[in-house]
Amino acid sequence: MIEQCQCCGSEIRRYKGTFISGPNYILSQDNRTVTKCSDNGWNANAIGSETIPLGTITIINFKIEKTVESYIMIGIAPKTIDQKLDVAYSKCGWYYYSYTGGLYCEPPLSYSNFKFRNDSQLPEGTIITLIVDTSIGKISYKINDSLIKTAYHVSFPESIVPCVILYNKGDSIRIIQN
């Protein structure tokens, strides 16, 4: 049975993908957990294995497994993102920063720590839910099941994927399925 939004009729999907391999991080055996394995720096851009279809609402749940300072960006990016790109959060995609509660994104918005949430530094065990409504170009977030507001209204390129950017060596985050 296909779940549909009662407001707009869009299909609601639970993300079933995993992470794909890339530079500066390692994956768990099931490819659901990504761990930064290189020196500290914004150069580990882990992307999802499945694209987010246009015309749907896709829900993706992440769990912060391990973190030093919560220097983790969670969002979406074009599937073509350069996984080695340094500071990709300001050049390619739309992100929530779990350390400050700020938003970061590519031009033309070019957010740089735009204050989105008042608290900061999300601890280990925090569940971050990313809700992507491609039918109306909306990106929203929940923190531990508490809905915060819509973060972005944007026009999506055709192929977008979940993207997590890790800074600290040893930090890890997991795609969880409900």
Language model features by range: what are they?
Residues 1-178:
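PRY/SPRY (B30.2) beta-sandwich protein-interaction domains
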